[in-house]
């Protein structure tokens, strides 16, 4: 990831890149001039030095400083012939706001839902596709339920996607729009790239959080009016948001758990992450949630295969507090949505019990 960029260092840009593994690379005018191997030292201090030719004279250039990952803070000094020409420090907020000066290669993912997402991104410039997909979603849900219920469910999905949009705007990102995908939910797009794992967590999890709020509102409306319409809306909206929290990319849960696991660099953290995944699978099967447990296994396998490549990511990892907070936030959302589904399954109504039956398939 890009740690530092000086736009004018002897008339050319000076860029420092590095990873949590310890390696660093220094580029002057996009040419590699110094590097530090991952195994070179565990010290937070860094020192890069290179020479430039100016006619018959030699210009000695140095970049020194201190780098701390948790919490992220880098202080630096740039020197030319032992004279300081630039100095300062950067924290996580600076990383969030930066625009990387090198193109970011898209991550390679193979997933059926991922292919749908890729197709959506390819069509995102066509405004007509929004109308087409919204109509297709309305027709699909009308076929399963009533026309009125389909409209209400789509409104819930829009509220879910609005949660993503609000999070993007919080980080100052421009949004492209919201697309509805029949039976899969929706997709909120942005023209800009994220720079930190925390941004990925917040943007991903705000959709299901807004979805939970909508289900709770419908639940309260059911208690007040006794209308089964609101009960059905609450439970099926909870089911859609719960599926979105599965650890399968590019679903919201996949992004959240990937950001947590990819931010861990200690053996203890890896063991705890693996233990939590195994515990989640065991709990799912013990509660009769066969489908949920199976998809949880598939998602964890996908993340495990990609885990070794985590140091090649341009995203700033979560600190220890961010990892714990994100995990508790995620588990709390899953438990809340499951609670809603179990509550309505306990009413004895056949239709309201359907989401729980689906999870136990």
Residue ranges and their predicted role:
Residues 26-33:
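Amphipathic alpha-helical segments
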Residues 2-13, 18-23, 36-56, 64-361:
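Hydrophobic transmembrane alpha-helices and their immediate loop junctions
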